């Protein structure tokens, strides 16, 4: 009898000491929009996704080996995408040259970032927070323009009734309740949206990133906000090199203008070769009056310059 009481008491003790949420799942570590407002490092991660799938970087497989994508060459790698396409494995759910999915996924992240960026406390001091917000927002607008260009290059085309269409322009992030059957905007409307994003990027970003030594060297748009050189370096200094800048945004606009002026699209885009040339001239003007003279005579032997190699760490050589 005594043994039974011990067993019963032990069972009751275990029962009363068990977890009270045995049948309720624990809260997962998924951040909400409200969480991100107080977590700037996480919030800027949304912008970081646009760089992970950057169409100009190898993470997005932009630099594809296409020498075997011709009629007179074939890969002997049985897993090669072009070989599989040529032998009947090219399907809607197996497209080795697909770019729509990763480009639109990054577009979604950029929209999510822009929606919360005004609410995030980017730094404890007001000036630092404003400068960081300005840089991150300009970065996002510039990257969205870059993605628009690559989406048009991959997906724009003429319809059977003679319309030149681009992509559906989405300026808000999508949710499970969004309308996923939005019609494609015209090519011209897509160009106009890309130009608006480029203008915002130019308005917010410096021409190039890099440390300055005096406040006199800080671009006017930042000194008008009250920023000195140390605050400028903190946000736009050497550590930010290779991010979207005003010069890169202009280059994106010039490239898209060349695409729009090409014979494939000019009739529907309304962009002429002269307009495209003028856009490209804005970029070439940065090279100076005699760019040929500025070319390093021994630049083809960069590997012999030890200082240049050391400077790669800082993002330049």
Regions of interest found by a model, annotated:
Residues 19-69, 295, 299-306, 310:
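Membrane-proximal, proline-rich intrinsically disordered regions
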Residues 210-237, 302-303:
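Charged, glycine/proline-rich intrinsically disordered loops and linkers
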Residues 1-29:
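Bacterial Sec-dependent N-terminal signal peptides
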Residues 167, 188, 251, 260-278:
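Acidic, serine/threonine/proline-rich low-complexity intrinsically disordered regions
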Residues 243-246, 285, 289-317:
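Extended ligand-binding clefts on enzyme/binding-domain cores
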Residues 45, 79-158, 176-210:
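Conserved, well-structured interaction surfaces
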């Amino acid at each position: 009898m005594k043994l039974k009481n011990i067993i019963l008491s032990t069972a009751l003790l275990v029962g009363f000491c068990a977890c009270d949420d045995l049948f309720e799942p624990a809260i997962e570590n998924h951040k909400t929009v409200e969480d991100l407002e107080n977590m700037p490092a996480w919030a800027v991660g949304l912008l970081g996704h646009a760089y992970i799938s950057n169409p100009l970087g190898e993470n997005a497989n932009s630099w594809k080996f296409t020498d075997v994508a011709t009629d007179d060459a074939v890969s002997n790698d049985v897993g090669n995408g072009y070989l599989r396409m040529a032998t009947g494995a090219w399907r809607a759910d197996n497209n080795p040259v697909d770019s729509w999915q990763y480009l639109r996924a990054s577009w979604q992240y950029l929209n999510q970032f822009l929606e919360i960026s005004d609410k995030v406390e980017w730094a404890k001091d007001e000036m630092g927070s404003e400068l960081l917000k300005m840089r991150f927002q300009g970065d996002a607008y510039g990257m969205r323009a870059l993605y628009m260009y690559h989406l048009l290059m991959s997906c724009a085309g003429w319809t059977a009734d003679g319309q030149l269409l681009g992509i559906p322009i989405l300026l808000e992030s999508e949710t499970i309740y969004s309308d996923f059957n939005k019609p494609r905007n015209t090519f011209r409307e897509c160009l106009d949206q890309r130009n608006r994003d480029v203008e915002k990027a130019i308005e917010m970003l410096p021409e190039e990133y890099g440390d300055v030594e005096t406040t006199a060297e800080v671009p006017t748009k930042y000194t008008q906000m009250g920023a000195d050189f140390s605050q400028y370096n903190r946000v736009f200094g050497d550590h930010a090199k290779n991010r979207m800048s005003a010069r890169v945004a202009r280059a994106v606009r010039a490239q898209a203008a060349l695409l729009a002026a090409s014979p494939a699209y000019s009739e529907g885009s309304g962009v002429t070769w002269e307009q495209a040339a003028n856009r490209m001239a804005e970029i070439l003007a940065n090279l100076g009056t005699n760019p040929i003279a500025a070319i390093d005579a021994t630049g083809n032997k960069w590997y012999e310059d030890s200082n240049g190699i050391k400077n790669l760490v800082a993002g330049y050589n």
